[in-house]
UniProtKB/Swiss-Prot annotation:
Probably part of an ABC transporter complex. Responsible for energy coupling to the transport system. This is Putative ABC transporter ATP-binding protein PAM_020. Keywords: ATP-binding, Cell membrane, Membrane, Nucleotide-binding, Repeat, Translocase, Transport. The lineage of its organism: Bacteria, Bacillati, Mycoplasmatota, Mollicutes, Acholeplasmatales. GO terms for molecular function: ATP binding; ATP hydrolysis activity; ATPase-coupled transmembrane transporter activity.
Length: 588
């Protein structure tokens, strides 16, 4: 029988800065070699739970503990964080907190150097993990020079290289491009099978991770565990839907066409579902579905729920021959980019990690100055504007909220940008409270920012930019770390802004977001724009998707197996997305 490895008995934890517990009466045993998925709404206690396993609580985050937690025979409150780290490896949500080396290679090698391994062995292992994670060409880079996605991979390599018996992944797949995410999901499976590691994974985005390889799924709600059972039962009992957690799109589609999920022996094994018998049954069910969302004469037209379009008389933003590199010895991050963006559009920018997406946004906003090229806003050259002047016209919400936050409380952070605008305190309070309510943060108005979850901090940074009412809003992965409720609130709010004429640019790895909310997609590859078209056309260009590390959502994977023509598949996909959106099964 497997050995109990992680034991929580009547365990509660309350941060000193909060009035109520973040974990309340947790009773749980995780056995050696189990692979566990942990889900729940923002602020439900998931990340705090992992911090109690790796020792960050109580050693780095103080608070009141009652009950008992035992990690690999070590009592949590009686064991120092170093001893726990020998058994527990954590890949954090915020990778910048993990780097200790001056270069990526040094950072990956850090744990092995502490163990005084021979240099030849260290070199061999560093190169092996760098190759497995696609980091070979970045070993000499400073960690701070990497894209957020490559930072995530580097931090993973630094943990995986010393093979701890317990591995914790705290939203660690969220910054990865779709192909890298799929590779990392496969790597986690391989590590679990090869080393029999005990693995705990926290994820909000279940599209390509929820499958039958997990032994258990644990659901947190209001600081308690409300579900601890198999992933199959999770779907059959509609636990995700009840909790407002987005289920994989193909699951929503199966429900929509009336398929009895309990009759499917391989419900969470998508490749097995693609058998001929099932495909034929799915096809018949779709044929019987009488609704029609679009004209079949134009299968690639925009989905009907897109916002009102504004007449593009002239571009609002023009990029002319923009090139940029960080240091002269390094190749260009952006290569001779020229682009016209029109007012009132919601645009997505996609591409593999390191393709130049975030750098392009920083150049537009003035955080980085291009070596060549011109940027025009409403035909005005932005070169001579100060960073403050440009920020009043173009708002930028960074991927990592910790790179933006500078104040102690929620109110102070949102009010900061308004202080120089000659507004009365009453006017400032009115604007701050209104935007906090929109972002579902009004109940935290006087709370210290340090007490917020990562997802709540993300919404806070969005609020701090939106309160300035910019003409163009650029968001780098705005929904990372958000549960379905807050994901939908953010995107619905962005749609309302877009309907008012604000041009919105979203950098994302979320293919569902791209397909459901944006009217146009730019695809970057090695610092160049190689596609500028509608999201649906991106998904029908398989060579483009393979070249740029874009993976189709699970619904598309399923539809591609149907015995239809390409045009029929495009019509079907558009219909299904409209149906799911309409019935609130998906994206709401």
């Amino acid at each position: 029988m497997p050995k109990p490895l992680i034991i929580f008995k009547d365990f509660s934890f309350q941060y000193y800065s909060q009035q109520t517990p973040t974990l309340n009466q947790i009773n749980l045993t995780i056995y050696e070699g189990q692979k566990v998925l942990i889900v729940g709404k923002n602020g439900s206690g998931k990340s705090t739970f992992l911090k109690c396993i790796n020792g960050l609580i109580p050693h780095s985050y103080q608070g009141k503990i009652t009950g008992t937690a035992i990690i690999k025979d070590k009592v949590l409150t009686q064991t120092n964080i170093f001893d726990l780290s020998l058994d527990v490896g954590t890949i954090m949500q915020d990778t910048d907190n993990q780097f200790v080396g001056l270069t990526v290679a040094e950072d990956i090698a850090f744990a092995l150097e502490n163990d005084d391994l021979p240099q030849s062995e260290i070199y061999q292992k560093v190169n092996m993990w760098a190759q497995d994670l696609g980091l070979q060409s970045f070993l000499d880079y400073k960690p701070q020079e990497l894209s957020e996605g490559h930072k995530q991979l580097a931090s993973m390599a630094g943990v995986l290289i010393y093979n701890p018996s317990i591995l914790l992944f705290d939203e660690s797949l969220s910054n990865l491009d779709p192909v890298s995410r799929a590779k990392m999901t496969a790597l986690i499976k391989t590590i679990h099978q090869k080393y029999h590691s005990t693995i705990l994974v926290i994820e909000h985005y279940l599209e390509d991770i929820l499958d039958d390889s997990f032994d258990r799924v644990i659901v947190f709600e209001d600081e308690k565990i409300i579900y601890d059972n198999s992933p199959q039962k999770l779907i059959l009992e509609n636990i995700l839907t009840k909790q407002g957690i987005q289920e994989p799109t193909y699951i929503s589609a199966l429900k929509k066409v009336g398929i009895n999920l309990g009759s499917l022996p391989y419900l969470l094994n998508l490749p097995a579902l693609q058998s001929l018998d099932f495909v034929q049954y799915f096809s018949n069910q779709l044929t019987n579905l009488k609704k029609c969302a679009i004209s079949q004469n134009d299968p690639t037209q925009l989905l009907p729920f897109f916002p009102k379009q504004f007449a593009p008389f002239c571009p609002i933003l023009q990029l002319q021959n923009i090139s940029y590199h960080y240091e002269s010895k390094q190749p260009n991050i952006l290569n001779d980019i020229s682009l016209d963006l029109f007012p009132g559009k919601m645009i997505s920018i996609v591409g593999k990690n390191g393709s130049g997406k975030s750098t392009l946004a920083k150049v537009i906003c003035g955080f980085s100055n291009p070596q060549t090229g011109t940027i025009l806003l409403n035909n005005q050259d932005l070169t001579h504007l100060s960073l403050q002047q440009r920020s009043e016209k173009i708002g930028f919400v960074m991927q990592n909220p910790h790179h933006m936050i500078s104040q102690k409380t929620v109110f102070e952070e949102v009010a900061l940008g308004l202080l120089g605008k000659q507004l009365s305190l009453t006017e400032i309070k009115t604007k701050v409270h209104a935007i906090l309510k929109t972002c579902n943060l009004d109940c935290f108005v006087n709370r210290p920012i340090s007490a917020l979850s990562f997802g709540q901090k993300k919404r806070l940074t969005i609020a701090s930019i939106l309160v300035m009412q910019p003409q163009i809003l650029i968001l780098d992965e705005p929904t990372i770390g958000q549960d379905l409720k807050h994901h939908t609130q953010i995107m619905t709010f962005l749609q309302k802004l877009n309907n008012k004429g604000i041009t919105i640019i979203i950098i994302t790895h979320d293919m569902s977001l791209m397909l459901n909310y944006t009217q146009r997609t730019l695809v970057l590859e090695q610092g160049k724009i190689i596609a500028n078209t509608t999201p649906l056309k991106i998904f029908t260009d398989m060579s483009l998707m393979q070249k740029t590390s874009l993976n189709p959502i699970s619904l598309i994977v399923l539809i591609n197996k149907l015995p239809f023509t390409s045009e029929q598949k495009n019509v079907l996909l558009t219909q299904m997305l409209a149906f799911l959106k309409e019935d609130c099964c998906y994206g709401k």
